[in-house]
């Protein structure tokens, strides 16, 4: 496992709303890669999408803003009603996957 810079952080965001079957995970991946973040976007059985992103804290916070902003300034697909965030230490993930 590679060492992470101390300013790196892990964001886990549970996105509620109409976010499955609309290209939301693809959009999230494109935004995360644009920001230089690693992680994943995963459909959950209850209709939410779980977004995990690791990287510099300011970029993770920017992704969080993009996930929930109303109206979206970044052409976000779907309709987001709520985003629940959790912060933790990074685990050293690489790339960004849609699951």
From Swiss-Prot:
What EC number(s) are associated with this protein in UniProt?
Answer: 3.6.1.7
User: Is the keyword Hydrolase assigned to this protein?
Assistant: yes
Q: Which UniProt keywords apply?
A: Hydrolase
Q: Pfam families under this entry?
A: Acylphosphatase
**Entry's Gene Ontology molecular function annotations:** acylphosphatase activity
Active site (record annotation): 25, 43
Q: Does the keyword Hydrolase apply?
A: yes
Alphabetical list of InterPro entries matching this protein: Acylphosphatase, Acylphosphatase-like_dom, Acylphosphatase-like_dom_sf, Acylphosphatase_CS
Q: Which domain of life is it from?
A: Bacteria
Catalytic reaction list: an acyl phosphate + H2O = a carboxylate + phosphate + H(+)
Q: Which residues form the Acylphosphatase-like domain?
A: 10-99
NCBIfam families in the record, alphabetically?
Answer: PRK14422.1 (NF010997)
Q: What is this protein called?
A: Acylphosphatase
From which source organism is this entry? Answer: Corynebacterium efficiens (strain DSM 44549 / YS-314 / AJ 12310 / JCM 11189 / NBRC 100395)
């Amino acid at each position: 496992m590679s060492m992470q810079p101390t300013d790196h952080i892990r964001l886990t965001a549970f996105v509620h709303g109409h976010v499955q079957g609309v290209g939301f995970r693809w959009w999230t991946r494109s935004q995360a890669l644009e920001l230089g973040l690693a992680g994943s976007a995963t459909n959950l059985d209850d209709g939410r999408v779980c977004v995990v992103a690791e990287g510099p804290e300011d970029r993770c916070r920017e992704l969080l803003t993009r996930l929930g902003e109303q109206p979206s300034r970044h052409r976000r697909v779907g309709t987001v009603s709520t985003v629940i965030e959790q912060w933790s230490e990074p685990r050293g993930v690489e790339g960004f996957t849609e699951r």
